[in-house]
Structure formats: structure tokens, C-alpha cells
Amino acid sequence: MTNLEKAARTYCLPETTTPENLACRWTCNVNFGKRFLAAGYYYTYKEPCYYGAVYEHTDDDLSCEGEIRLIAVSEERFEDNGHALAWAMQQ
């Protein structure tokens, strides 16, 4: 199992989905060109709890119904969702 697969399981991230489905499950998400970025919260006692995730459109359908595929999840956890999204934008 790859690190990406482990992170997807830990944070319950679907490996493929649509922006619409992901937006219904995560409150902090952004269309960013051909990528779709999400920040999520994973409780860890007295430690930073936010992570970033990057999805990529699998075809030219950039609408909310186009398929996206998980390509990166932060190994680091951040103090807030803004820092998690900033990480995702740099990927």
C-alpha cells in the first residue's frame, strides 16, 4: 500500500469522485485550474489537525460532475485549513 493510499484511508478520502460529491463532504474546497483542492480536519489531541488534499481532473470536463482523482495528501498536519490549502496550491 502506498503512502497516498494510507493517507486516503486515514482521512476517509475517496480516490476517485466528483467535485460535487467532495464539496458535499468537505467544507473547505477550491477549484484551482485542472485541480480540485480540499482541506480537512482530523482530530489529534493537542497537535495540528488540518490536512491538505489535491485532486486532478481525469478528463476535460471541469464541471462539478467531472471525475477527479486523488494525487496528493499532505504528510504534515497544519494549524488551520488556510495553511492546508496553501500547501495544496503549491503541489
Specify the residue positions occupied by each region the protein language model found.
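Terminal low-complexity, poorly structured segments
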Residues: R9, T18, G33, T58, ...
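Short stretches within intrinsically disordered, low-complexity N-terminal or propeptide regions
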Residues: R9-T10, R25, G40-Y41, V54-Y55, ...
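Alpha-helical interaction segments
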Residues: E15-T16, N31-G33, G40-Y41, I68, ...
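Short aromatic-glycine-(Arg/Gly/Cys) micro-motifs in beta-strand/loop hairpins
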Residues: A38-I71
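A short, charged, amphipathic alpha-helix used as a generic interaction element across diverse proteins
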Residues: S63-I71, E76-Q91
